[in-house]
Amino acid sequence: MNHKIDKNEFKKSVVANVRNLYRKNIEEATAAQVYHAVALAVKDMIIDRWIATHEEYDKQDAKIVYYMSMEFLTGRFLGNNIINLCEQEEIAEALKELGFDLNAIEDQERDPALGNGGLGRLAACFLDSLSTLGYPAYGCGIRYRYGLFRQQIKDGYQIEIPDEWLKDGYPFEIRRSEYATEVKFGGYVETQWDGQRNHFVQKGYQSVLAVPYDIPIVGYGNNVVNSLRIWDAQPLQSFNLADFDKGEYQKAVEQENLAKTIVEVLYPNDNHYAGKELRLKQQYFFISASVQRAVKKYKEKHDDIRKFYEKATFHMNDTHPTVAVAELMRILLDEENLGWDEAWEITTKTCAYTNHTIMSEALEKWPIELFSRLLPRIYQIVEEINRRFVEEIQKRYPGNQEKVRKMAIIYDGQVRMAHLAIVGSYSVNGVAKLHTEILEKQELRDFYEMMPQKFNNKTNGITQRRFLLHGNPMLADWITDKIGDEWITDLSKIKKLSVYVDDEKCQQEFMNIKYHNKLRLAKYIKEHNGIDVDPRSIFDVQVKRLHEYKRQLMNILHVMYLYNQLKDNPNMDIVPRTFIFGAKAAAGYKRAKLTIKLINSVADVINNDRSINGKLKVVFIEDYRVSNAEIIFAAADVSEQISTASKEASGTGNMKFMLNGALTIGTMDGATVEMAEEVGQENMFIFGSSADEIISLENKGGYNPMEIFNSDQDIRRVLMQLINGYYAPQDPELFRDIYNSLLNTQSSDRADTYFILKDFRSYADAEDKIDKAYRDEKWWARTAMLNTACSGKFSSDRTIEEYVRDIWHLKKVKVELPDA
């Protein structure tokens, strides 16, 4: 049964927590202190369910998926946990009676700094769905001390500062030091013969202790609580008193500093050797700890390690965790003393891999020198996997050295992690139909031809519980009022909204909710940016990681183009528009950071130009993260999904906008293709070259953007403004690198690598269609409602059911709580 809380007991619990934690009465407590007290009271409600869930898993001897990911971009937990416990009204009321507003208390929580982009957010959505559907799972990751970084904008530039999310402790985590695990780096491997077989022993290594912290992942309304297990790195001996007494203070804490470095930040800059080494260390650290712990857990109840795969699946989210293939082999060979063939059979029935990108820079490769020095035993195992695989290739394709060059795991001084994953897994999936097709026909074609049975598609999804129920409560209530609440756990039911799309009263209600959400975002922008934006203007939004293929540059060039038109003709009839950007650029990615500066420079000029009467505004939202994303998705009119076709594997922001009733302007790329199948292309603004056209142009070595520059005076004018000081009077050369990248003047890359100028006119036409369409209020309202009604396919619940059916083969578990 699902226990409901007693409101008065909850109030007592919060008051007691404030006293015990801070030696204060509730009236004296700060909002941050009340947040901690409320979080602990909610955690108390979770604990019984958490224990009951794991007891049920043990009782049923359930198969578990270990979802291994470098990132988990969870967002705040308090609000989500309260919603999934189905206690929102009671708790909001209890806090109101104590004199506090639940939303204000939720705002005290720092977003956990455990991820950055879509990869990490997908992992978080998957965990939410696994718990809600009742499937046994562990998320396995790293407990970063500072995450990627907190973004500040100073003088238009991105400044990276540490994200100190753990400064005041994190109330939802539990330290599990009893499961601490030793992880070994470096040294050498000694071979010892026992008369029957060789034993491989790592000697002269450095060790760190991996200590797990568990965060509960609460299922919606079903008592199921899975765990996100994040590993902290600690020294085996943290403080050497003997060294300290000799006055060698640095040496005394050397081990501690070594360990701490591993978990300091997500994606340390790898433009240099030390950064590369640290990244590989991080990956092996959390994978070794997770794999060792999974094997130990299995052995607590089972004697036959040969059946390990019947009770565990290791799912590798992108290439970062793929060293799991070799680590499981190491344990089976060296610790369980199995022969190679047996160990390989178990490993290849345990590991599954999701490919997230066709961008070659993201398909990780490690220099042999680094890999073999840092992980000597793992390297030996990878060498042997490679030797056997190359033999297989040669048997299959005699004399074809080209196949070996393209497919070998170790080649040309590098260890290719994606190849290790494909060879060592029983399943390889892409994340949208188009992406999987490109993998099979282009990027991984040789592998697909050799082992087609491994390949499958699993189109990504999002959790409607965070991005609609929590992020857009007004719309969620309205939908429930119209069609009931089944959509919360079965998003396909949202299709029932279709019957209301032509109802004028419903259209008005729907757009009124959108307006209220725009007011909420306008307030956020005023508070954080000091910019007044008109909630009646079109909110045109692009929020996502900053990368050249995502083409934020094309968006801001189009804003410059529109501004030029307005300056030439101040009476031009356009619907006022607010262009909203949010993005972090990787710390070492110069051009991406320069693009942020360009957006902010354009914003400064446009927002301060009174002659255009506020018809255009440009806003860059600082430190884009899950908590402000929820506010942004709910308020958007237009969703910018404008990646170069073929480059975006799936995208999930596109789905969040659609669910919240925004209209998409986009290329036929990633999952946007499938969104068009669901809602109809006529209800989106599709533009630009197709994936096939882009791939064909790339195979020919690109195109000549100078022809466009010479023949299109509007585009030429915009590009000249990059180098004539129009947006940087103090430093006219500031944006020269962007100009060069588009026209290949003194640039090492191919001219306009991402086909921005090629697609520009088509993009500008689509943007113009938006201006015309927005004037037809009924059409817009109907189309916005239709987008929400057609988003049922894009729930991560559907995605997870497909993973379970085709890849993981888990069984649902029901959790009943004993009567209190």
What spans do the regions from the language model cover?
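A conserved ligand/cofactor-binding region detector
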Residues: M1-A820
